[in-house]
Amino acid sequence: MKKHLLPLALLLSGISPAQALDVGDISSFMNSDSSTLSKTIKNSTDSGRLINIRLERLSSPLDDGQVIAMDKPDELLLTPASLLLPAQASEVIRFFYKGPADEKERYYRIVWFDQALSDAQRDNANRSAVATASARIGTILVVAPRQANYHFQYANGSLTNTGNATLRILAYGPCLKAANGKECKENYYLMPGKSRRFTRVDTADNKGRVALWQGDKFIPVK
């Protein structure tokens, strides 16, 4: 598939990906029965970092998603939005959803601006911390509908999400092609209205298994 759900945008200037701030999972999910979510970020480098965080609502988490207006200014809040993170330190960032309690799934981009700090001599008597390298990291937050309807259809190795909330789907068992080995596994996120065919696992085999997650609930399909 050309379009992948939940892409990561990592634009760097003067810093390599290995040195960038560790923001955890590329994609995060806030289930329908929760209005808060926490993400732990870590500075694994040997210098302090200045972190600024911004939120954008997206029409879709796919490659063609566009930034759109939020339904209200305080739809999604976070704290802290700016912090100084010492070397080898961690911090918990908390997100709070205060938007409409309807049947619509919402997508947000969390933009992390990460700047490394070092001491720079301004004059003989004064030293100050200045940014010496920077990175812009984008991750995705999916807020499930407050009124979630989980429905799906499965036939001939293909799953269709007929509900209104993204599903995490998986298949495991004998490989469809011998070249891939004996046992294979596939994991995908399936948005509402989308279908996905498993291409590595032989789901027609009696030992082939298909399952999915509806929020925190595990559902065997085959």
Curated annotation (Swiss-Prot):
Induction (UniProt): Negatively regulated by H-NS. Positively regulated by IHF and EcpR.
UniProt similarity note: Belongs to the EcpB/EcpE family.
Function: Part of the ecpRABCDE operon, which encodes the E.coli common pilus (ECP). ECP is found in both commensal and pathogenic strains and plays a dual role in early-stage biofilm development and host cell recognition.
Pfam families found in the cross-reference section: EcpB_C
Chaperone in keyword set: yes
Keywords: Chaperone, Fimbrium biogenesis, Signal
Keyword Protease part of the UniProt annotation: no
Protein name per the record: Probable fimbrial chaperone EcpB
Signal peptide: 1-20
Species annotation: Escherichia coli O7:K1 (strain IAI39 / ExPEC)
Domain of life where this protein originates: Bacteria
